[in-house]
Amino acid sequence: EFVNEYLIKNQPVIVTDGMKDWDREKFTPSYLKKEFGDSLVQIYNDLFDLQNVDTLETYFENNFDNDAPAKEYIRWYTQLKEVDFFWSDDLFMELSKFWNHPYFVPHNDLSVPFCEKEKTRSITENQYPYKGIFISGKGARTRLHKDPFNSNALLCQFYGTKKIYLYNPSKENAGMKDGEFVDLKNVDKEKFPLFS
């Protein structure tokens, strides 16, 4: 049902019981700081530019419990390619016992990552492209963008709230020009006259 009703139709959906069996307490800032605070993480601005590499603990200290909105966020992926970087594989290995493959997501017959009908893959056990954890203080954001590989993103909100804007792929030309996407907070009507 999930594939036919939502994925194939490019129809966004919020699944409210997708994490009911997960130990979400293990994904709170206090737990992550206590268990992984010494880990080095990549810190980005809203245009996806790497700003700094620092410890997770330092990021929390600088961006949580502040009155001013956070300007930067952590994007911490599992290893995508063979380069020396600050990957989150150890984090996901440690956290794997606290979450599971969402019940509504297929285990087989996948395009990205490829998985034949007779085989299965689990998000918790297998490599998935761009599997990562994103952490941000209140007010941090990413700009409007198109996910790589024409992928269908699966976001699991563990803590706090998130405002998200989704646009149908048919609207891509209205919000993108010369490789640049419209800034939703400051729409340039001259550059993006069709965007609404």
Model features per residue range: what roles?
Residues 1-196:
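N-terminal accessory scaffold of Fe(II)-dependent oxygenases
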